[in-house]
Amino acid sequence: MNALVVGATGLCGAAILKHAAEATSFNKVYALVRRQIPNSAARVETIVNEQSDSWPESVPAGVDVFFSGLGTTRANAGGLENQYKVDHDLNIAVAKAAKERGCRVCVIVSAIGASVNARLPYNKLKGDIERDLLALEFERTVILRPGVLLGERETHHKGFGNSVAVFLGKLVYRGRFQALLGYPVYGDEVGQVAVALALSDDKSKVRIVESAEILSLVKQENTQ
């Protein structure tokens, strides 16, 4: 079984790559990136393509599971339109290419509050991604909706609001007030659950996992 990871330099994508590389169920784990990344795992093969617009053409055949932790912020992208091109357009284009090459399972990191009817642009963006991803009709689709994401990022996410949310998220993590921030979760926990669910015996065509369940699944995984 082979896997493809996009967004492998981001917080959740890097965690997915790490856990997928550790999973003996995968023979090979491809990481589609714009620049070379350091990784000593024997089963990881990096596909470097600086032109992300042509990423769909770089998707290898023989991939069974498509993982995406691909995403950016409006500030980092330089506006909502550019953010949409990365978060939505690129995700869907690569997922479609993977599906056309025989991929059966799709696991993507979305966000809490994702909805096509959301008033907030970010939540609507994530809702649009989920809608169009489901339209591709993979045999199995897993959508993870984490709350505030915690952990060390390779690149800084601009924006005062994001910094405040992370600061508060660390304070309430797994505490009595965690629900107020949508159950903050570490990127590594998201990656762990993404890989575990991709390899699970769950036959559900669509599974949506909210942040509270991500935390619960991590606890279950770590006590086995």
UniProtKB/Swiss-Prot annotation:
This is Protein FMP52, mitochondrial. InterPro entries: NAD(P)-bd_dom, NAD(P)-bd_dom_sf. SUPFAM superfamilies: NAD(P)-binding Rossmann-fold domains. Transmembrane segments: none annotated. It is found in: Mitochondrion outer membrane. It comes from Eremothecium gossypii (strain ATCC 10895 / CBS 109.51 / FGSC 9923 / NRRL Y-1056). It is a peripheral membrane protein. Keywords: Membrane, Mitochondrion, Mitochondrion outer membrane, Transit peptide. It comes from the Eukaryota. Residues 1-44 form a transit peptide. PANTHER family: OXIDOREDUCTASE HTATIP2. GO terms for biological process: import into nucleus. Belongs to the FMP52 family. It holds the Pfam family NAD_binding_10. GO terms for cellular component: cytoplasm; mitochondrial outer membrane. The keyword Aminoacyl-tRNA synthetase does not apply.
